[in-house]
């Protein structure tokens, strides 16, 4: 959520930043009008409450002096009714103001390139050379079905479209990738966590999924809980409504969880294989940083994600998302895209973002530089490290052999119990 003080002091700056996201900037004027109205109503109620208190003292004094206080009592009742009326109006104005504020995205960083959509994202790095096959390469969904590593048909019977059973060596490869990713991040200083995979609405609000993106979520109506779309949600909310001490920063968490997404609006896209699922496993990184350190932390986090693909020796590229493609809560984002031969293209496998104080303001996560200092908002960051299913697909496609087998990447052999080939 954006700071209302920024609207008051730098409205043109806010308009400029929102315009970069193609958002109608008249919302800034609407928010300022509501803010002025709310402050005027607040001032009026404070005046009336002061008047009521003074009148109450007068009534008490009259009663002590055995004087008639009827007029003062009547006046105090009228003031009380006026306070109730104004409080009702203030609550309505304040709620309208909040509703508008919480639906506005973060302001993009000066380092975020300007652009209208994904076609204007900027490539900042490319690593590795896509493999040239001397045979007809197959898509991962065909390879894994031939090797009995996955069963999409039975998953559709059990759950519906966009689900998969991973079986035999498929299940083993998935687990190997999870453990390899977690071990890599632990070596990079991240604390491993096991998180809840059902969270409440306050948690979803804190990280920005609610209220704007509710249609993308699965909800357990009876309990009022949501399945997590990413472990960013529980990891970030771990410190919700808390004040951290200076020595707690930076804090770096990593977790592997199942993630659940309705994929609203993606009908017809990536309908085969493991690329776009309702349920998938993902290793996540989350960081809590001092504001002055958060952009350097983003570079470091992105390197952690990239290092997974480098150790697997799979080509990738890193792009800086432009202002028209960047996520709702992010100020700056890098997407890491892995090479998938079946698409003859790079596909997103990680998104690493600096959310600055956007989530921290919603979730009320603060820190103190020393015990006597004023509490400040932390900066939060999150990044995939990596999406396990997409990494699985990338390994299968990039390490496929002409006879239909898959060579196990060298770094995964210990995690596969010494197995070097899946056949």
From Swiss-Prot:
E.C. number(s) listed in UniProt: 6.1.1.11
Record-linked Pfam families: Seryl_tRNA_N, tRNA-synt_2b
Domain of life: Bacteria
Subcellular location as annotated: Cytoplasm
A molecular function GO annotation: catalytic activity, acting on a protein
Keyword match Membrane: no
Binding site for ATP: 261-263, 348-351
Pathway connected to this protein: Aminoacyl-tRNA biosynthesis; selenocysteinyl-tRNA(Sec) biosynthesis; L-seryl-tRNA(Sec) from L-serine and tRNA(Sec): step 1/1
UniProt main location, coarse: cytoplasm
Residues passing through the membrane, by range: none
Reactions that this protein is recorded to catalyse: tRNA(Ser) + L-serine + ATP = L-seryl-tRNA(Ser) + AMP + diphosphate + H(+); tRNA(Sec) + L-serine + ATP = L-seryl-tRNA(Sec) + AMP + diphosphate + H(+)
Family the UniProt entry places it in: Belongs to the class-II aminoacyl-tRNA synthetase family. Type-1 seryl-tRNA synthetase subfamily.
Record remark: domains: Consists of two distinct domains, a catalytic core and a N-terminal extension that is involved in tRNA binding.
Identification of the protein by name: Serine--tRNA ligase
Source species of the chain: Macrococcus caseolyticus (strain JCSC5402)
